[in-house]
């Protein structure tokens, strides 16, 4: 990460896409996409997804590392080209607890990530805990971030410190996505970004972390990009020029969250304006969902009724029976809920792919389609971009490859923006 940031600060148009997903097919796609390049791939886990207690994936940081490395070995992607990051590391998962208990767990969380070899650490102590004022004072956020940084430094080896990098910043979207419709978004003011940096510098120095400050590579701000279930707020470069100019006088770049669904031109403009770390998650699993839904429609027409997976029906049944991952995000009417379950850009389906019933139905569908020749006309109908690539000889009409290429479409836009 430090090398990439140095190149960007030296004037090169270069950025990196941060893949925020624990889905094996998304990780496989991210690694396979860059297998034949010289680029490094940044894969991040969030604190609620992966933590010392397992998170909602059931994986500790060490488990996640091995999970990613196993996929890399299968794909033929060199492990040393993978950068592992931890996102929203702090009290995010324990906001209902008092600050002492929440921070104690947060310290162990950060230590677990660093011990597992994660080298990009987002120190995010912006969440209020039980009894805290809402919002927290910037000084309090910075002091807690310094506690987390101290924890990271205390377990890092000398070799790890050479690679270790920190991201600071409090102006981040709700981890997991917006819960309501959006019409506009607040772009970070320069004075707020400057205050975030100033308060963190003061807090770090007070804890004897002056050297660690040199490892702070980025600050999280809101450049004016966001999405909800069916709306996308697109990047308006002219609105972020004050931010773009301010960061030029520092050693850092910006990290932009929720960049999903922007145009490839917007990604290029974001990187030009020093938002050099572009985080993406739901757009990748949304592309995966689109591919699976398309294949399910193809299966419906090609496979005898008694042998079909019933994949789409199974997904709806499970999500309606177990609504905990979407209930507080989606609309309440039955028809509206079904539309959101299927097609929301927030893509809460991503939390359900590991469910045994859904996983088994998808596997059945894949086996069914591997045993038949999919007519080109059907691929043109349901996966038109993939049809074009099949016609040009770039792609085969194999279900797994069709899913991979659908995810590649998202990664292609980021590659264009991050140029190298």
From Swiss-Prot:
Pfam families: GatZ_KbaZ-like. Forms a complex with GatY. It comes from Escherichia coli O157:H7. The keyword Transferase does not apply. One of its GO terms (biological process) is galactitol metabolic process. Component of the tagatose-1,6-bisphosphate aldolase GatYZ that is required for full activity and stability of the Y subunit. Could have a chaperone-like function for the proper and stable folding of GatY. When expressed alone, GatZ does not show any aldolase activity. Is involved in the catabolism of galactitol. Pathway: Carbohydrate metabolism; D-tagatose 6-phosphate degradation; D-glyceraldehyde 3-phosphate and glycerone phosphate from D-tagatose 6-phosphate: step 2/2. Coiled coil: none annotated. The keyword Ribonucleoprotein does not apply. This is D-tagatose-1,6-bisphosphate aldolase subunit GatZ. GO terms for cellular component: plasma membrane. Keywords: Galactitol metabolism. SUPFAM superfamilies: Aldolase. The lineage of its organism: Bacteria, Pseudomonadati, Pseudomonadota, Gammaproteobacteria, Enterobacterales. Belongs to the GatZ/KbaZ family. GatZ subfamily.
């Amino acid at each position: 990460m430090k090398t990439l940031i140095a190149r960007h600060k030296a004037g090169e148009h270069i950025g990196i896409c941060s893949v925020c997903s624990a889905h094996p097919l998304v990780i496989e796609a991210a690694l396979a996409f860059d297998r034949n390049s010289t680029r490094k791939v940044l894969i991040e886990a969030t604190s609620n997804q992966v933590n010392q207690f397992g998170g909602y994936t059931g994986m500790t940081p060490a488990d996640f590392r091995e999970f990613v490395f196993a996929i890399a070995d299968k794909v033929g992607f060199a492990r040393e080209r993978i950068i592992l990051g931890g996102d929203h590391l702090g009290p995010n998962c324990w906001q209902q607890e008092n600050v002492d208990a929440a921070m104690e767990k947060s310290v162990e969380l950060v230590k677990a990530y660093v011990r597992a070899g994660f080298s990009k650490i987002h120190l995010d102590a912006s969440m209020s805990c039980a009894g805290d004022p809402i919002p927290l004072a910037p000084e309090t956020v910075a002091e807690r971030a310094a506690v987390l940084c101290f924890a990271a430094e205390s377990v890092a080896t000398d070799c790890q410190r050479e690679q270790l990098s920190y991201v600071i910043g409090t102006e981040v979207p709700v981890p997991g996505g917006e819960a309501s419709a959006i019409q506009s978004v607040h772009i970070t003011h320069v004075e707020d970004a400057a205050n975030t940096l100033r308060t963190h510098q003061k807090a770090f120095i007070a804890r004897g972390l002056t050297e660690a400050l040199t490892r702070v590579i980025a600050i999280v701000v809101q450049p004016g990009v966001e999405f909800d279930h069916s709306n996308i707020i697109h990047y308006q470069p002219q609105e972020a020029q004050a931010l773009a100019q301010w960061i030029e006088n520092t050693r850092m770049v910006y990290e932009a969250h929720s960049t999903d669904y922007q145009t490839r031109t917007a990604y290029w403009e974001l990187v030009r304006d020093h938002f050099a770390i572009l985080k993406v998650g739901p757009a990748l699993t949304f592309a995966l969902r689109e591919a699976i839904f398309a294949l399910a429609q193809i299966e419906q027409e090609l496979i005898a009724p008694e042998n079909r997976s019933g994949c789409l029906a199974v997904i709806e049944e499970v999500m309606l029976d177990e609504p905990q991952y979407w209930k507080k995000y989606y609309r309440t009417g039955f028809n509206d809920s079904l539309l959101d379950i299927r097609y929301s850009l927030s893509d809460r389906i991503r939390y359900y792919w590991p469910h045994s019933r859904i996983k088994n139905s998808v596997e059945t569908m894949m086996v069914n389609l591997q045993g038949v020749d999919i007519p080109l006309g059907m691929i043109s109908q349901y996966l038109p971009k993939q049809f074009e690539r099949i016609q040009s000889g770039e792609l085969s009409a194999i279900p797994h490859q069709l899913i991979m290429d659908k995810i590649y479409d998202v990664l292609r836009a980021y590659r264009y923006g991050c140029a190298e």
